[in-house]
Amino acid sequence: KLAELSMTAILEWYSKYLLHNKIIPHDKFEIVWPEDLNYNDFVTMYEIDQLVLREDLIAPPQITYAWYQYNNYTHIAIRSIVTQKVIGYFTVLPITDQLYEDIQSGYFKDNDLSTDNLRKYDIPDFYKLYIACVCIHPNYQNTSAFNRLYNALLKMMIELATEREIYVTNIITEASTIQGEKFCKILGLKRLLNTKINTKIYGATLLPPSWQLRSSFGTKLMKYYKEKYEELRELF
């Protein structure tokens, strides 16, 4: 027992030393897939939000965890193997057509969003996706964490489409910081408008396909969507 406690203390000290000196071990990350998250992870996500986002645009963990309980595909995260804590995540919400229009108009905040505005992936169908948050802890923003997480999101979208016929027609998101705008550009999203609350709305269309992606997972995703569009063209 004493040996276990000593090892735990050493690991905790080592983790704090790495973070204090901003020494991030190369690629020591693992993806936390949607079904593997717990409430404590959402508290950690909230703490990351407070470091990088505007306070008035942050949804508390009680709200985000309720989204996750309603549809556990709403969140995908990445964790440090060293600290065993989430260090970044995507919030990707399948939303109603009405909410999509509200977000597109520029008059909406995440903490106003309830499960009434969300959809479950319970039937094969076409869905609109709201990327409510893309966050990486500041200490990990110059590592491979974002690319690992981004590719995991694309992999999840491929699997939803090919295995369950869950197709995303439109993606929309809101950038409130310079880092958020950077992420939107990396994601290949186009700016749609500037809002009156000093944010920018970005978006992309998958059906008909216009989203430009460069990664191997992105190329695979859009190849599949282009084939599906040709198959279902009469619906659009």
Please name every model-derived segment.
Residues 1-37, 159-236:
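Terminal substrate-recognition subdomain of acyl/acetyltransferases
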Residues 14-63, 70-71, 75-87:
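Short amphipathic alpha-helix that is part of the acyltransferase structural core
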Residues 77-79, 91, 203-206:
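Short, well-ordered beta-strand micro-motif
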Residues 91-135:
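Conserved acyl-donor/pantetheine-binding loop and adjacent beta-alpha core of acyl/acetyltransferases
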Residues 131-136, 141-159:
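Conserved acetyl-CoA-binding loop-helix of GNAT-fold acetyltransferases
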